């Protein structure tokens, strides 16, 4: 599970960089863990170059002996396995099965740990593969999806009733997220040519370990760039927290713990020193090695900290096809090249789109709460210790500290 968390972190940071390229100044909020686990459901039925590309994008090739395929012994029919032996691939077939079982078993354990709250927080997710009813998913694939991911692909009629299929998918997502995400698929997002769509929606609400002080909250100018400000409701907290400083990037890093195993890590440059959000240098330097160094005990120390951060809610939707293609996952979306032979006997299956939405509330208590209406703030306190004043764009990560998994990553650049 530790190796999988490492792969998920690398995927999360790579995904963030790709999204940043097409969203240089906008708010960002995604759940890379949720996207990765959903794509793994598709990987379970992929083969050949399609599978290799997916494994590489998801960083599974960095884990142990992950090879050409992730198929488990259950995936090989008697004929398939016999053919492997006849081709003198018996040892590699065994290794491939073991590698695949390692990945998918680890996902099963990781999901179970994350979805079993150790504190007062809510994590609602909806992950499912929807395929054209003519696909006729293999029973072996259905059973493995249930075994590892507690879900199974669902057949819908894209060919004759695309709009009804869209409404059915949206209704399912709305139910799974308890009404928080009602319209994941926009109008026109599926049609009669759609073969398979992957949906992934996740909603997080948590309680701060130390709640913010409502009575001291108020309006404060948030600088979206070097020449523009927007009034925003600021939250105030004075508490002992882990805080650090990345000298070469002139960036503060602060840990705000939720109840349980969840923490939010915020990265805030000292000033806006570029022509956009002030985050360009920080975003360019994010990678696996740097991130681990920034959040380590070598960087973070407990101190008496005064904190101002905006109260905000983000609900961001993405169609990830082009982003995943740019990361190297090309064949899965190509009608002529996609290989999903582990899913179906049909050779014309391909992914049409991957829909993702993530939503979060950041309030005084952490969960949805009434806003305070204090006096307008015009300056900072006289506190002699470190201050963390997020009055300009910052990055934030919501992490499960037990599994070291990045559940969410976001950029807050504008109220």
From Swiss-Prot:
Pfam families: Serpin. GO terms for cellular component: cornified envelope; cytoplasm; extracellular space. It is found in: Cytoplasm; Secreted, Extracellular space. GO terms for biological process: negative regulation of apoptotic process. Glycans are attached at residues 23, 75, 261, 339. The signal sequence is not cleaved. The record marks 380-381 as: Reactive bond. Belongs to the serpin family. Ov-serpin subfamily. Interacts with PSMB1. Inhibits urokinase-type plasminogen activator. The monocyte derived PAI-2 is distinct from the endothelial cell-derived PAI-1. Not required for normal murine development or survival. This is Plasminogen activator inhibitor 2, macrophage.
């Amino acid at each position: 599970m530790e190796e999988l968390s490492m792969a998920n972190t690398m995927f999360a940071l790579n995904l963030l960089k790709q999204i940043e390229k097409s969203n240089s100044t906008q708010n960002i909020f995604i759940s890379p863990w949720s996207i990765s686990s959903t794509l793994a459901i598709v990987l379970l039925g992929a083969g050949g170059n399609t599978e290799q590309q997916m494994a590489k994008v998801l960083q599974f090739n960095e884990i142990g002996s992950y090879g050409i395929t992730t198929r488990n012994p259950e995936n090989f029919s008697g004929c398939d396995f016999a053919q492997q032996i006849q081709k003198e691939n018996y040892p590699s077939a065994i290794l491939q099965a073991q590698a695949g079982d390692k990945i998918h078993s680890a996902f099963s354990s990781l999901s179970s740990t994350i979805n079993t709250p150790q504190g007062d927080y809510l994590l609602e997710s909806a992950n499912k593969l929807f395929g054209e009813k003519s696909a006729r998913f293999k029973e072996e694939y259905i059973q493995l999806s249930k075994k590892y991911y507690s879900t199974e692909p669902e057949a819908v009629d894209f060919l004759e009733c695309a709009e009804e299929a869209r409404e059915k998918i949206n209704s399912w997502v709305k139910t799974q997220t308890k009404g928080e995400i009602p319209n994941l698929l926009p109008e026109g997002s599926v049609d009669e040519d759609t073969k398979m769509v992957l949906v992934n929606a996740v909603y997080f609400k948590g309680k701060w370990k130390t709640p913010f002080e409502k009575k001291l909250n108020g309006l404060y100018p948030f600088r979206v760039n070097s020449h523009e400000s927007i009034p925003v409701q600021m939250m105030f907290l004075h508490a002992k927290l882990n805080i650090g400083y990345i000298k070469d990037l002139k960036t503060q890093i602060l840990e705000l713990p939720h109840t349980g195993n969840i923490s939010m890590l915020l990265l805030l440059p000292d000033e806006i020193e570029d022509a956009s959000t002030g985050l360009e240098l920080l975003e360019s330097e994010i990678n696996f090695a740097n991130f681990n160094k920034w959040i380590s005990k070598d960087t973070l120390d407990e101190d008496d900290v005064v904190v101002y951060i905006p109260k905000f809610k983000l609900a961001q939707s993405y169609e990830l096809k082009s982003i995943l293609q740019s990361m190297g996952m090309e064949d899965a979306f190509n009608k002529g090249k996609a290989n999903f032979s582990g899913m179906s006997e049909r050779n014309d299956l391909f992914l049409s789109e991957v829909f993702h939405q993530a939503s979060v509330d950041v309030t005084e208590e952490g969960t949805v709460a009434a806003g305070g209406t204090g006096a307008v703030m015009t300056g900072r306190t006289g506190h002699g210790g470190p201050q963390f004043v997020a009055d300009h764009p910052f990055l934030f990560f919501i992490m499960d500290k037990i599994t070291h998994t990045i559940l969410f990553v976001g950029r807050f650049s504008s109220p």
